[in-house]
Regions:
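Conserved PLP-binding catalytic core of the aspartate aminotransferase-like
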Residues: 250, 263-295
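PLP-dependent aminotransferase class I/II
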Residues: 29-32, 184-262, 266-269
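Short, conserved charged micro-motifs
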Residues: 31, 126, 283-289, 321-325
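PLP-dependent aminotransferase-like
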Residues: 85-145
Length: 338
């Protein structure tokens, strides 16, 4: 696992006043989620379902599929490792920059990895390919036609589409409609980001029954805990009322981006999501530490994304008050110390 994911609050003894380092929805109805968890708290005294069967049934119903087309995971990340295990030793294409756990999973299972820059991206023959749509860390959106072209052009290659952030990008089209036409497609969903439950760990995978069977052989029993199963079912049934208002969120993000444009030494990278990269003349690891120590503000140092360097960091869009807090802090930091 890469040392340096976002939301690394646990590493700091400093009080965090504003956490820009994670792409999780910042304004979720945590009181409602807490009440659902409390309702089911006694389930912790019993073993959960071995393969989260009732959650899988609800996922299948939600997506108009069969349970045989679904695997539940202890977060989306577990699913990436299951796929890498099932395709152990494969030739695998990884666009960069992107989420590090694709690479980490492939490294663990001895894949021959081919890193292809996202800029002017061209696919090629391989056994497996991972894409993140919209992409983390830069908010790039893959058009549905691009995804379908890859599936058509390389029918022997399994394409994994990670849609963990799709609720934050109105221009991104879900590709589950392609599942019926392409047996070489896997779609990953995370419950973590849109509903702000990263500590519960819950995600799921959709795909052709034969492909799902190949991967299911590597799953472990009881990989999803009892509380995650219950809140997952609740969110699939009622979650549309809890999703981010992306229209308002992205308007605030555009204001945030414009403010960065006016800051000397900071250049925001175009993004179609609420989070975005910023290129800076400063060193991001130092900037991160200064913001944390002096202002209690946490950003995501993006220097450890393959394809980026120490002059990139990532921020999520938060409330107007917290966005202004970061901008004021950057104006106050002495440039000579960065």
């Amino acid at each position: 696992m890469l040392n340096g994911h976002g939301d690394d609050i646990y590493k700091s003894s400093t009080e965090i006043k504003a956490n820009f380092s994670t792409n999780v929805w910042y304004d979720a109805d945590t009181d409602l989620l807490r009440s659902i968890l409390t309702t089911h708290i006694d389930k912790i005294f019993h073993y959960p379902e071995p393969a989260a069967e009732s959650f899988v049934q609800e996922v299948a119903r939600h997506h108009n599929l069969q349970p045989q087309n679904v695997i539940a995971g202890n977060g989306a990340t577990e699913l990436f490792y299951l796929i890498a295990h099932a395709f152990e030793g494969s030739k695998t294409i990884l666009p960069i920059p992107s989420f590090s756990e694709y690479e980490d999973a492939c490294t663990l299972y001895k894949h021959q990895q081919i890193f292809v820059p996202l800029k002017n991206f061209q696919a090629g023959p391989a056994d497996l390919m991972f894409i993140c749509n919209p992409n983390n860390p830069d908010g790039h959106v893959w058009q549905l036609e691009e995804i379908e072209n890859i599936l058509q052009q390389y029918p022997q290659m399994t394409l994994v589409v990670d849609e963990s952030f799709i609720d934050f990008a109105p221009t991104a089209q879900p590709c589950e409609s392609l599942l019926v036409h392409y047996p070489n497609l896997l779609v990953i969903h995370s419950m973590t980001k849109s509903y702000a439950i990263p500590g519960l760990r819950l995600g799921y995978m959709l795909g052709n029954e034969d492909l799902i069977d190949r991967i299911r052989r590597f799953t472990h029993p009881w990989n999803v805990n009892a509380l995650a199963i219950e809140i997952g079912k609740f969110l699939l049934q009622n979650g549309k009322y809890l999703l981010p208002d992306t229209g308002r969120l992205l308007k605030r993000k555009e204001n945030f981006v414009r403010a960065f444009d006016e800051l000397p030494g900071y250049t925001p990278v175009p993004s179609e999501t609420s989070f975005f990269l910023i290129h800076t003349i400063h060193k991001s690891p130092v900037l991160k530490q200064k913001l944390l120590e002096q202002f209690g503000i946490l950003i995501r140092d993006a220097s450890n994304f393959r394809g980026l360097d120490e002059h990139y960091f990532r921020v999520n869009t938060l409330s107007e008050e917290k966005n202004q807090m970061l901008l004021r802090a950057l104006r106050l930091l002495p440039i000579t110390n960065l």
